[in-house]
Amino acid sequence: GDRDGNPNITAEITTDAMELQVSHAIRVTIAAMNALRQMLSVSTKIVGATPELSASVEKDLKHIPEFEQRFLRLNAEEPYRLKATAIVHRLAFTRDRHAKGAPHVPNRDYANTAELLADLVLMRDSLLAHRGELIATGLLERTIRTIAAFGINHATMDVREHSDAHHNVLKQITGIDGYIEKSHDEKFEILTKFLADDVRFDTSQLEALGKKTVDTFVAINNLIDRFGPEAIETYIVSMTKGADDLIAAVVIAQQAGLVS
């Protein structure tokens, strides 16, 4: 996300990087769940399950018809393994949704890491309530901690840009004579009024560097829509000398729909 002074870091590169890290994170998480699934052969003939887990498995079976019938027969009395299998399916659906740019489907794929963690915690709590402490506090707990740390996005991306890049855009789209030469206080007053009045500008005629800056904000908005707010949480403005340097970025973010 660091494009400060680097012309090669475009909106497309940022999007590609996010897609790559999310794909990697989901692939690793699926592998972890498959390993966990092999350990969860606990039968209800020996160890029970909470009503919450049983209800969750029933809901999974309703929304995931792709469950192989042989697994349903073999694991009919193994709710923990069925739940782990459902999680693998939902992770695969999440990966496919991201690849296609399709909308989230509740109970089919995961909207965010919190939904995945809720499923894992449900399994852990059920195991703890039914003499399954060994696996609940072992491999399952380690899996929960790993996913809580990295999420299904692998990492939160920071985006960084030089303050001059934002003022360059505003010089072009506002058409204000001598904009760059104005003092920090003058720019701050102008920009805060733009924000307060929700002024919209035509960004279609920007020169290449200005378009690159605006495209970055559009890409951030799209990535947050696709991967959730945890995908990108921080935008860093370098070489700031006044409050106007920060407000300038916010005005452009407003044009991209990031700020209402």
Describe these PLM feature segments:
Residues 41-226:
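Extended, charge-enriched "interface" segments that sit outside catalytic cores
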